[in-house]
Amino acid sequence: DIKIRLGCAMPLVTTETAEIRGRDLNTGLPKVMQISSEQVRQAIEEPILQIIDVIKMALEKTPPELSSDVMERGIVLTGGGALIRNLDKLISQKTGIPVYVTESPLNAVVRGAGKSLEDLEKLKSVLSSSRKLK
């Protein structure tokens, strides 16, 4: 919740804050404190940079015929991480490729899996299984 509410991949023009409640790890007692969007950004910065490195590695291994499609159509972000503000802009900046956040990113994977199940025959060539698809 905090990651989505305050998280950002790039510094914001105006820092935002929120009150969080939890347990103090030193005393074990309940504690309330303020946390800023900049603190959250710094906390998630390293994992985000690792994700970008993996994206770059995948792009380097992409066959040329697919690379042109990616350059033309861009990268589409799905899932909860896609809700982190400016993640699309940072990935685009680091890769030089347009990046878009899909409509309803939290449901996109489920919708895509559902569409795949509707026509398994078309996907036989790219699916792997320990059993033969009938």
List where the protein language model places each region:
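A glycine-rich phosphate-binding loop feature that marks nucleotide/adenosyl-phosphate handling sites
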Residues: D1-R5, G74, R131-K134
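Residue-level signature of catalytic and energy-coupling elements of molecular machines
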Residues: I2, I55, L77, A113
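Active-site lining segments that contact anionic ligands and/or coordinate catalytic metals
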Residues: T15, P30, E72-R73, G96
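Tubulin/FtsZ superfamily GTPase core signature
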Residues: Q39, K56-L59, V99, E103-S104
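Glycine-rich phosphate-binding loops at beta-strand->alpha-helix junctions
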Residues: S68-I91
